[in-house]
Amino acid sequence: MKIARAIVPALIGWVGAVGYWIGVGPDEAPGASGDVAADVAIVLGAAVSGDTPSPVFRERIAHAINLQEEGRVSHILFTGGRAEGDELGESEAAMAMALEAGVPAQAILTETKSTTTMQNLVNAQLVMRDAGLDNAVIISDPLHMRRAMEMADSLGMIAQPSATPTTRYRSFGAKARFLARETYFMHHFWLFGE
């Protein structure tokens, strides 16, 4: 019983510290597009409804389009496969949005198989290698960025973060739920490597 009394507060403190660390985000200026530049922007996939990117995914896509329009990246690599019931895969829906926004087709790359963040990055790394691209800007939500960068680092990717400057997770409850989810998945990554 004494051990449990000591372990429980320590675990609560640990989880709280990890949650804070995730919430603060990576050290490399998340959300600041002013100083990022790379061969390619990797847009991590998110939900699609039918053929329409979710609001969260639209934020990521729009951020990548802005970086490409500013000349900070030459290519955009959209990641994400097709979920059951969707008309388009995540990367396909993102590509359609980018083309509609005027991004040249030759500047767009896709990978269509992944369903997790780690798969997004592993498959993106293969696409980059095939296209002769060496370094990347990884685009995701601010609270997702820490885990994404930990994964990219574990793969040996030359990458820097650029979190979306806005997020759809605005209310305290939405942020708390997403942060709890990210804290869980960060531990899952540390324990299982995915």
Language model features by range: what are they?
Residues 21-180:
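A structural signal for short, hydrophobic/glycine-enriched beta-strand patches
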Residues 172-194:
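A transmembrane-helix-recognition feature enriched in membrane-embedded lipid enzymes
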